[in-house]
């Protein structure tokens, strides 16, 4: 279980599906263990769609030191997870193997993303916190006016 503890004390708990996307799951968990996400923000928020975080630059252009293979149908991988409310998936650039550290949590269903992004788990607790994040005021490029900070991200056994 992955726990995202927000700076306001709110908690989001995520169950990872290693069978659906093993490379993605391992990469995400390794970044969590390294403390990579601690202090980073949800830098892109689109209500009725998703909240996106995991960029050390905080502007959508950053990532970790490595990219991983995209585990989704358009890249030749059978990933059964659909992009429904509460699902966590990897953000990427146009290159199907460009996912790194940026992820997004679905605020609403988005079937057009199925087969295009590596979904790898779902929120099991804290969708109310996701709803609160989705409701914050945003400005240019859907960036929150006030930073939405992940204080700590860790694995709960």
Labelled PLM ranges:
Residues 1-157:
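Cyclophilin-like peptidyl-prolyl cis-trans isomerases
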């Amino acid at each position: 279980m992955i726990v995202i503890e927000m700076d306001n004390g709110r908690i989001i708990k995520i169950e990872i599906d290693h069978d659906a996307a093993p490379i993605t799951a391992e990469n995400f968990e390794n970044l969590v263990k390294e403390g990579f996400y601690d202090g980073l923000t949800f830098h892109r928020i689109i209500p009725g769609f998703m909240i996106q975080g995991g960029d050390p630059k905080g502007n959508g252009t950053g990532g970790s030191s490595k990219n991983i293979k995209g585990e989704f149908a358009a890249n030749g991988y059978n990933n059964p997870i659909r992009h429904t409310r509460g699902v966590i998936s990897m953000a990427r650039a146009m290159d199907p193997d460009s996912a790194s550290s940026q992820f997004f949590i679905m605020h609403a269903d988005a079937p057009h993303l199925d087969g295009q992004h590596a979904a790898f788990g779902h929120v099991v607790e804290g969708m109310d916190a996701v709803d609160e994040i989705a409701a914050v005021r945003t400005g240019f490029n859907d960036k929150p006016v006030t930073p939405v900070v992940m204080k700590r991200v860790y694995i709960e056994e």
